[in-house]
Amino acid sequence: RDELLTMAENCDVIAHEPPKTFWQALQLCYFIQLILQIESNGHSVSFGRMDQYLYPFYRRDVELNQSLDREHAIELLHSCWLKLLEVNKIRSGSHSKASAGSPLYQNVTIGGQNLVSGQAMDAVNPLSYAILESCGRLRSTQPNLSVRYHAGMSNDFLDACVQVIRCGFGMPAFNNDEIVIPEFIKLGIEPQDA
């Protein structure tokens, strides 16, 4: 009951103002994703770099205020991933067989680099680890999980990624920042956005 009341309070807040907590921010991300799926007959709609834009909320609640513990944050991520599985798009039987059901190819990206004062800095943070751990524990087909790899990535995070890959459910995928970023820049994307 308390959890449902908190979810209802979160809905009241995020309907009229910016989220204040990690839970509210994650709930808002889910609602936005759901709206995009409904409005555009969604397919391959990405959450983007979730560990970057949700980290200020996670940091405040889990690391600074300790109003939310890490395990509960991972449980909230589990709930979000499970809710994503409820969204379905009718497909042919052959597609469903080849794709382990009817995935919508919703992608979450973690890791990579951020441009800070013109210098590329490793962007891995504690939420990157929590998202990775959540996906590794749940072993679900959705969301697809991608890691932006670069040579400056810590061995600890790389090892954590390899441990999840060893679970055998095909994630995370790796994208190479050192290849992809220059190509985005060639297309006219600003370096801080590439």
What are these regions (language model features)?
Residues 1-194:
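Conserved catalytic cores of very large enzyme subunits
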